[in-house]
Amino acid sequence: RAGDLGEKAKREVARFAFKHPFAQSMVSLIRAMVPYQDGDVAEQKNKYQDPVENSKAIKSLSYFLGAEITGICEIPEYAWFSHYMDGEELVPYHRYAVVMLIDQGYETMEGASGDDFISGAQSMRAYMRGAQIAGIMGEMLRSFGLSSRSQTNADSDVLHTPVTLLAGLGELSRIGEVILNPFIGPRLKTVVLTTDMPLEVDKAVDFGLQKFCSSCLKCARECPCDSISWGKKIMFNGYEMWKPD
């Protein structure tokens, strides 16, 4: 996935500034959970074929485990990565995505400047929780004979942004490549569980954010590094959006 960006990107992709040993400690645990994102599927024939009941059950489980908001969508082909890191072609293998938002915490987000250590730590805490939640859910479904895989920040075969939009969990905002949810704003991290279990899908949401972001401009005004656009949307890779710099 990094190969198309050249040799430097391939070298540097593994180096990331976590700002504090606290954040790095959580990263180690996140990476340790990667082998448990997938596994053998039980041979028993699964009996869970009702999409409506399955969706209610899987969402209830996600909330019990700690997800803030959960949505479901079918995975379009363009939401899958085309290749694995080693260059091998990736063939899409599941139909549905269960997309979960993890709240990074209002008080923590409100107290962070972006230059302090907590900005990285709150991200890693949310990613760690997400990996645990989706990992448990995937393991349970596989034990029922249902093929499933958790897609985390440490190892994901799907792009999270398109499935988050399709699952009705928010809209793109002026901030750029960041999804804003109507209840928790942009203070979220995502984790995805892909599966072939029959599910009832949700619809994409429109809560008026495009019109609001066209006139508000507060995020652009307050951005300390002036990376948020003051202008109108542009076309980027075939998509209309506000492009951060």
Named regions from a protein language model:
Residues 59, 68-245:
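Catalytic cores of enzyme domains
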Residues 1-69:
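Iron-sulfur (Fe-S) cluster-binding modules
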